[in-house]
Amino acid sequence: MDTMNWLDQVKWDAQGLVPVIAQEAATGDVLMFAWMNREALAKTAELGRAVYYSRSRGKLWFKGEESGHVQQVHDIRLDCDSDVVLLKVTQLGHEPGIACHTGRHSCFFNALQNGAWQAVDPVLKDPESIYK
């Protein structure tokens, strides 16, 4: 497949980014939301592991480069409007169930309960010990 062709079909935003959802392939759990630029999406397809674009750092973010929580990519999908990417992944590493920098399985651990956001999923590992 021509790399330029499939990347050209993505509707990038004004900053050259596309939103990305990482979903656990085995369970269907939504793990996280992030951004990719063209280079990150191409690298993800090439390497078979998630590479995102960090807007705060202004550079590629190889998921797991600091935490060890790598995401092996099984499938890359583009939504019907071509403006959102879905990665179906297996979360790997020394704590394979952790995708979030807070030490939780998913970044979506807050639930609206009685008009307030409440953390409803447990911390699996203290983030202080993950990011040394």
From Swiss-Prot:
Enzyme Commission number(s) of this protein: 3.5.4.19
Residues given in the record as Zn(2+) binding sites: 80, 100, 107
Source organism superkingdom: Bacteria
Cofactor(s) annotated in UniProt: Mg(2+); Zn(2+)
Catalysed reactions, semicolon-separated: 1-(5-phospho-beta-D-ribosyl)-5'-AMP + H2O = 1-(5-phospho-beta-D-ribosyl)-5-[(5-phospho-beta-D-ribosylamino)methylideneamino]imidazole-4-carboxamide
Record InterPro entries: PRA-CH (IPR026660), PRib_AMP_CycHydrolase_dom (IPR002496), PRib_AMP_CycHydrolase_sf (IPR038019)
UniProt keywords, alphabetically: Amino-acid biosynthesis, Cytoplasm, Histidine biosynthesis, Hydrolase, Magnesium, Metal-binding, Zinc
Listed HAMAP family: HisI
Record-stated family: Belongs to the PRA-CH family.
Function recorded in the entry: Catalyzes the hydrolysis of the adenine ring of phosphoribosyl-AMP.
Protein name per UniProt: Phosphoribosyl-AMP cyclohydrolase
Origin species: Acidovorax sp. (strain JS42)
Encoding gene, per UniProt annotation: hisI
